[in-house]
A protein has these predicted regions:
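Conserved ABC ATPase "signature" region
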Residues: 1, 20, 24-47
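Conserved ABC ATPase signature
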Residues: 51-55
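Conserved catalytic motifs of ABC-family nucleotide-binding domains
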Residues: 72
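Catalytic Walker B motif of ABC-type/P-loop ATPase nucleotide-binding domains
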Residues: 76-79
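Helical segment within the ABC ATPase nucleotide-binding domain
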Residues: 91-103
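ABC ATPase "signature
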Residues: 136-137
């Protein structure tokens, strides 16, 4: 399943209606239990009867995440899952994803410009610049290999090196 801040949810439905629609598309038998579980985990209980179009971007993000997880996928594709979120909500989403990944044993494919997020959520990384892979490895390997403090510094070093070659 896929989540992106660039894909909008149906605006005129309530949160519960949105999740129910997606649950029915996946033919989930225990849809109410699944909605209850995800709304509790993602702090959506108080929003279930709210109109989706009236939610904040952080609330919509959590609804989109619940939608993507409604059918308990084995693989979750995330495109900038915390883009435009305030630090507190972004941290909550990252913590949720870490816990959910371990609990449900799912794989997450993540596209992100947030290197702290990548470090926190990813075991294996492909760093790309202009659509070209510039390095790969796990966060610790990449940091040690390039003698930097963090992945952002690694990326900047590699990116500048690539620019000098062009």
């Amino acid at each position: 399943n896929f989540i992106s801040p660039y894909i909008e949810l149906p605006k005129k439905l309530t949160v519960k209606q949105n999740l129910t629609v997606y649950g029915k598309l996946y033919k989930i038998n225990n849809i109410n239990e699944r909605i209850e579980f995800l709304s509790e985990k993602l702090r959506l209980e108080d929003l279930l009867n709210s109109i989706t179009g009236e939610l904040s971007s952080g609330q919509k993000n959590r609804v989109s995440l619940a939608k993507a997880l409604i059918n308990e996928p084995k693989v979750l594709l995330l495109d900038e899952p915390t883009a435009s979120l305030d630090p507190e909500v972004g941290d909550f989403v990252r913590s949720f994803l870490e816990d959910y990944k371990k609990e449900k044993k799912i794989s997450i494919l993540l596209a992100s410009h947030n290197m702290n997020e990548v470090t926190r959520l990813c075991k294996s990384i492909l760093m790309m610049k202009d659509g070209i892979i510039i390095d790969k490895g796990n966060p610790e390997e990449l940091i040690n290999k390039h003698g930097r403090k963090n992945l952002e510094e690694v990326f900047l070093k590699l990116s500048r090196s690539k620019n000098e070659l062009n």
